[in-house]
């Protein structure tokens, strides 16, 4: 191994004697600095690359670098290095590594102007940089540099509420003086020279740290087993634990804790003591003795107090300590176990007490239920006994009703939970059959209504009624009506004649609020409608003296849309009867007029256009207009149908069959030197034959205006040598008067419409706010003259059904549903109005 490292300087270079040669041996320094990025390297200069080993070196041309050798300074004093004080290569490399970590780039590799000069150790040179002899400066001049600045930091602190001389924080709780540092005496570890607290720390925190108290307590406990050299016996200090403290702590010893299965066979190596020990489960660790060390190391033992001699450390009894500690822990565990067992037993007592109270309450409730059921059973058995034939005191229907009333009022729970259907079938049904045995509904339609109303409140199932069901096995009242009351109704309807409709209508009107809805529907659809349909098929309008509407229309409030299938055969029979009809026969109007509001507007208009309007047109065609001898019968026959035939159809007849002939007669009359006063009367007479509704039609108005124009042209022309005096003025006055009447009529119509709109607006404003959707439909029905009324006893899914004209609807959450062919279809309000029209 080479000893060249003994002659290296602090920078790792060779001495001056060895400048002329280079040693190629690998030293420890080379190995340790192999991967050191800051190690010194030789950078080949341009001259060395050109001349090789013959290159001359000039100290003036050299420049500082990070890896090359620097020039020798022969003016510096000679420094000798003692071989005995020279550090080893390894220690020197460690020092260099530590220096490299703190300062990767050496200061002497920079130009001379950079930083302080390197401290020299010999000669006449002094250190170029002074050290801090007294540590840090006093804090008296802390922040004095702000004198030479604008003091922005102090200003910002003062704006935020800082007061010079006081601490920081909202309540000035911060420290005022900087934290002082205390220099340790020697090079020992922390705490080796006692407390290191400063005067400032003692002033701010006078309380002794808990660690010092723990250390003192530990030393006292450690010295209890040591013999006092002075011979004085000190009274030992004992710590006592009460039973209440143990209960509050609730500690369970680890010895009672059963080890987990996965941890029971685990190899454990204990290296906490002087020797290595191996355990094969964690439970074995808990059984080892806590053997203390023989004593503290000499350097860790506290020095003896002044005035006393040092004592030898006392002896230790680990087995005795272990046994005593084991007895203490077993006692504590026994106390805790007993306390938990006591608490458990108390909880069991409380739980059993609650269960006993609950069982007692259930027992009392069962006893009350048994007593109530016994009383109910006694009442029922009494009713059954009185129902037996040959009983001296037979049961009546009123007495049975009182028994059921008692059951409902006094024993409501039992009455609600009992099977009322079987009870009613056994007791009530026989009495009810005897009650209606001689009843004739057509003669006395109100017989039994009060009795049925009373039994409805006693037997009807409210839950079933709310769901809209018709389960006969669950509702005693529905079953009573179906099995007892319906047979009498079927027998009466079978003998009833449809043309004698009033008694049957009165009977059903009286019973509709009492009987179930589905029973009423069954009567109307299965019993009444087939009878009416059969009677309509046999009806002959030419031979029957009783009009059909007299025995069909009374069923409209009850059946409503169910009568729609009857309207088509009625219209066909009426149409066949009108084939040979003449407008002079007024009986046709009497027969058809009641059906105008029953048929839909479209079907009624089609019927009139097909069967009536052609007959009226033929009658107008036969009308002869003769101013001197006028026959008005044909005209009266046509005008008499104005309310039955629509205005448009009637105006069409007049335009086609009346006005052409009327204007032709007027022109002929004016061409023969007429008397204009007579023409004026004739004109006004014909105009008075029409109603205001017909005169307001634009076509009729145009025809009469055309007649006025013809008369004006006649009087204004020069045809004829002789002109009646005042004729022109008379015709002009007539024209002006007629035009003014038309204008006044139009103004009056507009004013009337405005008043109606105003009244309608006032009515809407005066109505209840907010107005629901049903009120809105009702208002629209009034505006369009449409009948809107509820269907008595008719519901769909619990919703009330209404008739809107001839349409059946129901309202659900602001939506109108219209009855279609198979399902209910939602529609808008305007579509509903259009369908009703």
From Swiss-Prot:
MF-aspect GO terms: nucleic acid binding
CC terms in the record's Gene Ontology section: cytoplasm; spliceosomal complex; U2-type post-mRNA release spliceosomal complex
Positions bearing Phosphoserine: 2, 59, 98, 144, 210
Biased composition (Acidic residues): 14-28, 91-102
Record keyword DNA-binding present: no
Region entry Required for interaction with DHX15, spans: 1-50
Swiss-Prot/TrEMBL keywords: Biomineralization, Cytoplasm, mRNA processing, mRNA splicing, Nucleus, Phosphoprotein, Spliceosome
Residues in G-patch domain copies: 149-195
Protein function: Involved in pre-mRNA splicing, specifically in spliceosome disassembly during late-stage splicing events. Intron turnover seems to proceed through reactions in two lariat-intron associated complexes termed Intron Large (IL) and Intron Small (IS). In cooperation with DHX15 seems to mediate the transition of the U2, U5 and U6 snRNP-containing IL complex to the snRNP-free IS complex leading to efficient debranching and turnover of excised introns. May play a role in the differentiation of ameloblasts and odontoblasts or in the forming of the enamel extracellular matrix.
Protein family membership: Belongs to the TFP11/STIP family.
Protein name: Tuftelin-interacting protein 11
